[in-house]
From Swiss-Prot:
This is Aurein-4.2. Signal peptide: none annotated. Disulfide bonds: none annotated. Keywords: Amphibian defense peptide, Secreted. Belongs to the frog skin active peptide (FSAP) family. Aurein subfamily. GO terms for cellular component: extracellular region. It comes from Ranoidea raniformis (Southern bell frog). It comes from the Eukaryota. Expressed by the skin dorsal glands. GO terms for molecular function: oxidoreductase activity, acting on paired donors, with incorporation or reduction of molecular oxygen, reduced pteridine as one donor, and incorporation of one atom of oxygen. Transmembrane segments: none annotated. GO terms for biological process: defense response.
Length: 23
């Protein structure tokens, strides 16, 4: 559903932020 999609996008966004910080 929509909520699941939002959760997935938030996970991707958080992962991108973590990757950016570590770089």
């Amino acid at each position: 559903g929509l909520l699941q999609t939002i959760k997935e996008k938030l996970k991707e966004f958080a992962g991108g932020v973590v990757t950016g910080v570590q770089s």
